[in-house]
Structures are given as structure tokens and as C-alpha cells.
A protein has these predicted regions:
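Histone-fold recognition with a strong bias for associated Lys/Arg-rich disordered tails
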Residues: 1-71
Length: 71
């Protein structure tokens, strides 16, 4: 499915999958992709977030407030 993605995009999706597992979720949602973008740290998305002074810790705190962990 990800063969048409760039290496960086595949890395973000891999990190998003790790985040989904951390939340004990059986899906990859936008919240996981957002965390993956920030965690990857070097893509356009990560750089935009850095310029807005948004880091992984801040994003994780806000995601955890909004998203419940799975069973």
C-alpha cells in the first residue's frame, strides 16, 4: 500500500503505527499521523510545526487529552 510513498512518508506512517500501538488502538488515525509527523522531525510537516513552536511533548499531551487509550 505504501509503495508509492516517499521514504520519509513511509517513515512517518511507521511512526504513526507505533503511536497507534502505544495507545493500544487497532487503527491509524490522524492523531497518530500527526504524532508521526512531529516525531519524524525533518519533513515539511515537521518543520511547519517547529516554526509554530509545536513539539512532540506538546502534541502528545493534547492528543492524550482528546483520545482515549484502547482496551
Amino acid at each position: 500500500m505504501f509503495e508509492r510513498f516517499t521514504d520519509r512518508a513511509r517513515k512517518v506512517m511507521s511512526l504513526a503505527q507505533q503511536e497507534a500501538q502505544r495507545f493500544n488502538h487497532e487503527y491509524i488515525g490522524t492523531e497518530h499521523v500527526l504524532l508521526g509527523l512531529v516525531k519524524e522531525g525533518s519533513g515539511v510537516g515537521a518543520n511547519v510545526l517547529k516554526r509554530l513552536s509545536i513539539d512532540l511533548r506538546k502534541v502528545r499531551i493534547e492528543v492524550e487529552k482528546l483520545v482515549k487509550a484502547g482496551p
